[in-house]
Amino acid sequence: MRRNTGLLAMTLSVGLITSGCTHTPDRYYDFTHKIPLFAPTAGDITKPDLSKPFKDSKAVASFGFQATRKVKDPFKTQKGFFQWGWFHFDEHYTTHLDSTDHYLNSDTSKNADKRSIEEYTLKDIIGPIVYIDISARVAKELAKNGGKPSPNPAVTNFSESTGATVLPSDIERVAGQITDRSWIVVHSGWDKHFVGDPPKDPFLHPYINGLNYPGFGKSAVEKLIEIENRKGVRINGIMMDNLSIDSGKSGRGSDGKNPFGDGWYAHQLGLTRGWKLLENAKDTGQLANETGKCTLIAG
């Protein structure tokens, strides 16, 4: 089964195109987290030594390992030498794009788009932004625990029951802006929890929070599909400042317990429609005060 090729070194930039007839962007924003790198442990590139960061690298949330950089012997010339080396990292590390072949349904008739990244055209990765801001609701829920996420939903709960997540009403509110090739960009403010040494159980990193974080649940995904069908359009994808576009609750499936069950609805239902998912975005709030037409360029 083909997996996605993660664009971990991508630049996710947005140019603001002013309203009217001009097509000259006058502002650009970068939504990528840096890729932190660490020296290998005893020369083993598969084992990062977090006590030996490259430059100002700091560990981040990840289901896999932290990235390593192993330096090769210098390539010498008469005037100096070239520095070079190897990198070793998970393809879903930091800001990256999930391609449409990342999730394949067991029912192959549901896999309408099975392309991987090298098969995409510019039309697949560039499109107008539709912006949704849920950060105030997320901050209100975090305030119940002094601004810190708790994996216990009795303390902080990022599901539809509290409203501290993406709701179908959020999608319906921007339905008029959704067109062919749109990018839905969601700002939750959750990225502030991204940096931090991983605990022994990576699921308990504050950013992952025991699969208790804001994002798209099944009803929000279904609302977006309903709007696509109603308008006869197909979006390019979704970008959000969280782990998976899906909410943590979505990842736990219909029984709320099983990450290996029937959940991950943005992946299960969206990727197979041709949506691309830009995960672990940074500082999506940069767009909060923009009133012109914005375009997302993933590359």
Predicted features, each with a name:
Residues A9-L16:
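Bacterial N-terminal signal peptides
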Residues T22-G299:
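Active-/binding-site microenvironments in catalytic and ligand-binding cores
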Residues M1-L8:
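Bacterial N-terminal signal peptides that target proteins for export
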